[in-house]
Structure formats: structure tokens, C-alpha cells
């Protein structure tokens, strides 16, 4: 089971949209996938068409990462209706904010790792949609991960946030989790004709070299349309998808 965190230390860069796109790609490839909705906004759970009735959620798991609790907080995505494949969601909740303090204990940081160990044989891939901060929830996600991808957009403040994120990943790798590595930087919401965007992409490449992943993701209405309809991007109709 490979665990990938999708992170950004700045809100509004399309982190959750990227998570949903990666989930759609994994589903299209037939990978048994679990998406962990760790962002207190819980938008992944909405975007993947989850029925939360009678189920526990990520806050319950962080309080008690036992197998019984973990399995009760996992629901199949509505994407699977009428389509083959396995893609589940560990349901998000605004209550997760209660576990996002600035100074988590070592015990708290390892709770998600403990929870995922209970379902390790069930999945090929785990995607974690992280909170847009560097508090306890993000550190908990990174401690449970093999790789982290950092989502940014080609703007001044977002470039600075990507730099902070990569420095923090290295800090966690050295101090807590030697297996953790950055997968790279996904540059999202690119307007190809924008000189400012071209400048910022060059700046990112100058700063981070091969960590800047290709291709960069242009702004596309199909992403918002698929997300708004709670459908996987890879089955969304039209050339724009």
C-alpha cells in the first residue's frame, strides 16, 4: 500500500481538486484506492458522492484509531455506481479541526499511521487530502505517508508557500519519518498566455529543478464541472476533460 499526501500550505490553490483528479486517475487505472479526507472542510467527501448516514468519520478515527472505528468511518464512493472498481473514502468532518493544534504530541502524530495499518491489505493506494496548514493534521498525514506532493499555483505567495512546504517535509523526514520523500510540485491553474505565470513557473524551476512536475495543469472548466457534479474527471464528457 502506497500512501501519498496532497498538500498545500496556502488555501485556494486547488489542492482538493488535484486530489479528486488523482483519485479519478487511480479509479480509471483499476487501483484499489482509499481517499482520506483530512481537510476539515470535508470537500473530498462531497466531491466523491459519499453517503455519510450512520457512519463515523475522520474525527472518530483520530480519537480512537482501532480497526473497528476505522472501518466504520470508510464509505464507498458514489463513483462506483454502475462502474467496476474499488474506491473508498475515509469520511471527512469539520470536527477534525479539534485535532489540528499547533503542537501535537508524538502519540497524536502517529494516529493516522496506526489507523491505516488496520486496512493495509485492502488498498493499493491511499491519497490524503491534507489541511492547508502546517499544524497537527498535516503532520499526522505526512507521518503516515511515503510521498508528499505539494500543490501550488504560479503566484508570488504560492511559490513562497511551496518553499515552506518542502522545507517542512524535510524536517519531518529527518525528525520523524525517514521514509517520507517529496514526490514533487504540481503547478495548478496555469494560464498559458500569462507572462506572470510564465515567470513564476520559471522561478519554481530555478528554485526546485526536477521537483517541478510536468505537465503543469491549466485552468479548465471541466474540472469544476466534474467536481460540482460529484463525478470522476476521467468519465466526464467533452473534449475539455
Can you annotate each of these PLM segments?
Residues 1-241:
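P-loop NTP-binding core
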